[in-house]
Amino acid sequence: MKMPSFGYEVEKSFLPVDGRKRIVIERIFPSVDCSDFPLKRVIGQTMVVRAYVFADGHERISVHLAYRHIADSQWTEISMEELGNDEWEASFPLEKLGIYEVKIIGWIDHFQNWLEKLHKLAENDKDIAVELSIGIGLLEKNWAFSRSQELKDWIDRLKDERLSLHQRLQLIKNPYLEELVQKNPDRSLSVESESPLFIFVERSKAQFSSWYEFFPRSWSSVPGKHGTFKECERLLPDIAAMGFDVVYLPPIHPIGKKARKGKNNALIASPEDVGSPWAIGSAEGGHKSIHPSLGSLEDFRHFVKKAADYGIEVALDIAFQCSPDHPYLLEHPAWFKWRPDGTVQYAENPPKKYEDIVPFDFETEDWQALWEELKSIFVFWINQGVKIFRVDNPHTKPLAFWRWVIWEIKRDYPDTLFLSEAFTRPKLLYGLAKRGFSQSYTYFTWRSEASEIKAYMEELTSPPVVEFFRPNFWPNTPDILAGYLQYAPPSVFKMRHVLAATLSSNYGIYGPAFELCVNIPLEPGKEEYKDSEKYEIKTWDWNAPGNIKEFIAKVNHIRKLHPALQRTENIRFIQGDNPRLLAYVKELPGHGDPLLIVVNMSRNTEMGWIHFQPESVGLDPSKPYQLTDLLADVTYTWHGEWNFVKLDPEACPAHLFQLSQDGSFSP
């Protein structure tokens, strides 16, 4: 038919393939962009799905949810419960790692509608002979669809002319027949949801993890010498004691010699300069090789196993870029852009230039071979025992590539996790998460005011973002010494650590710069560290005076003891009269043990009144209640809703309260 549209004609037909199908499945939720992208969950959770399903008129409908793991051929179907207003709900357990597929199926329940009509007629002594014949016809349709022999036997009995009308009616009223029909419905005119709902089910570390980043080359037992994996094994007990369960290593590959950067990112390197680990590749190897000064592949595997002995996983940095002397440039020149003068195009982000890094050309005609090779890098390191990858600058590679490669890896290695390091525009940042990244760096690093933190957390913990984006909060990185940490006292480092570790269930620090409170920038107005470890070997005194290792260990210990801190979305902000005091509750419904956190966001002593409603966490508001500060091991007694707080950052910049009343912790 012709449809006028803003002055021009559009041809459109709304003729369905089968107009007899009357069910409408209008919405399934939760979903990401109308099920274009997978939801994120962890193993052991219960997946709750709702849908709007209805039909014209007043007839009863049946709605089922079907689900399966993609490794399984068979679907499991469960009935959905009607909640009212044409909303339906069902839930099922997520028992396997990997990818689940979900669809909704609906149909008119003609037999149930007929049965209700029959009961009404029988109650009013109406003639039901014709209605019984109609019912038998409906049962025959059910049998034609399901081919259930048991249902066929019931139909034959109902058609037995030796039975009286009353006897047939009693057979029809038998609850077992109704149950049998429900198991064998006539779904010849059923409707399925147009797009399947996919769910990435990951292991619990996708939801709760504590990351510690360090440069292995800086940990030789001889100051100034290049460290090795063997020497780094001595760090593991202290890292574990601080409460970290992921050790993240910057790239461990050979570093290019051409255009190598010197100290503080100098354009000209001296012969002694070690270069940036992100300038990957030399004559000694590329992305599947280990820098010879770090040790051998066997040394690396031993380091991974040793870390596991302390409950720590090793995460590797995957940076899909090359130095100018990476073997790929000779072996696959088509994977790079070449300038008219015959030189390769190095990386640029004007006005910044990265002469020591050459990006891949993802528009190459040989793109499929490039994609397969990059996938093989993940597989290679998975085979060395690595199951967590921090991906460098994924926003500079096509999103279609990430969707493909993460799906491929997740299908074959479902326990693999991916952290996206993309400090970029919000839609691009979220777009990467939608395509499968388990966790993502965030803008937390630049949120310094209480109002900014509140607004940002509300964004991250609200639909639709909460369904696909898992934040990982980092107060610092080798590239970023945020302004509020520059020249800051240890109390500010403690404050940012408490925020990162209690706002988000996933967080990380770059150490030992963080716990040693390194606070000197390259120059005023810059976020880079002075004498950045990216470009030189450092010698660290890990136990130097003023370090906050014990404080970090205490916070991480509290995180492990209290499930409320092992989720991100379960946050509720509390109002107060001082904008420099940030207060919030973390709780898991049904688990008890809610926590109240109050953080001083300034460098000065702050005080104010907090409006906390004790009944919101199950406490009796008519009685006093106790708050035990898990950081200071001090207990306070509060009364009612408004209570006074004073925080001296030099003593401790935060309260982390556990709530109790009459000697019992909050239910």
UniProtKB/Swiss-Prot annotation:
Q: Which SUPFAM superfamilies has this protein been placed in?
A: (Trans)glycosidases
> At the top level of its lineage, which domain of life is listed?
Bacteria
Report the InterPro entries cross-referenced here.
GlgE, GLGE_C, GlgE_dom_N/S, Glyco_hydro_b, Glycoside_hydrolase_SF, Ig-like_fold
User: Which molecular function terms from Gene Ontology are attached?
Assistant: hexosyltransferase activity; hydrolase activity, hydrolyzing O-glycosyl compounds
**Keyword ATP-binding belongs to the record:** no
Q: Assembly and partners?
A: Homodimer.
Name of the molecule in the record:
Alpha-1,4-glucan:maltose-1-phosphate maltosyltransferase
Q: Which organism is it from?
A: Methylacidiphilum infernorum (isolate V4)
